[in-house]
């Protein structure tokens, strides 16, 4: 009787070990397949200067080299489409704002939140749409008929006068 029980235990051990390997193989294959399905490539190419960005985008952008305490820039471009300048503090831990320019007349802000305040104002000859809350502007967007522009404000606090002054330095 002991021999039969021992043989039965050995058979169960062999069978259960074999099953474990098959499950592991299936999980590994599923993980490999899932890894291939995720991720969208970043279309932006980070560069050192606005001139380099202009070569990639096919047009130029004039923008301030700093704004208030945000004097560390990340400049990036999408081929034949957009230039973006992101203004960080010196430690690059806080984003103040970002400026974008792209071909066309569509809204390129990428911000589709709803705000309490939305106004269309004149800055020189430009009609600028400003969106924000409590007197602080979060988004300013405009077009010159050929290019679209936007200012997305993150941690910097900008009012209408600040935005107007900033827009006058962007081309």
Each model region followed by its residue ranges:
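Surface-exposed amphipathic alpha-helical segments
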Residues: 153-171
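Intrinsically disordered, low-complexity serine/threonine-rich repeat tracts
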Residues: 24, 28-33
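C-terminal motif of bacterial Sec signal peptides marking the signal peptidase cleavage site
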Residues: 13-16
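Short helix/strand-capping connector loops at secondary-structure junctions
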Residues: 143-151
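Bacterial signal peptide processing site
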Residues: 18-20
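Short, solvent-exposed recognition patches
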Residues: 35-137, 144
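Sec-dependent signal peptide recognition
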Residues: 2-7
């Amino acid at each position: 009787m002991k021999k039969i029980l021992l043989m039965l235990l050995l058979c169960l051990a062999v069978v259960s070990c074999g099953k474990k390997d098959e499950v592991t193989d299936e999980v590994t294959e599923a993980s490999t397949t899932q890894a291939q399905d995720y991720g969208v490539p970043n279309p932006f190419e980070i560069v050192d200067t606005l001139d380099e960005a202009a070569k990639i985008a096919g047009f130029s952008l004039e923008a301030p080299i700093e704004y208030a305490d945000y004097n560390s820039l990340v400049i990036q471009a999408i081929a034949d489409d957009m230039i973006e300048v992101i203004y960080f503090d010196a430690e690059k831990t806080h984003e103040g704002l970002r400026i974008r320019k792209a071909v066309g007349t569509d809204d390129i802000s990428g911000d589709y939140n709803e705000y309490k305040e939305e106004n269309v104002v004149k800055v020189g000859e430009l009609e600028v749409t400003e969106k924000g809350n409590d007197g602080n502007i979060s988004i300013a967007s405009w077009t010159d008929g050929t290019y679209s522009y936007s200012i997305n404000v993150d941690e910097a606090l900008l009012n209408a006068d600040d935005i107007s002054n900033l827009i006058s330095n962007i081309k």
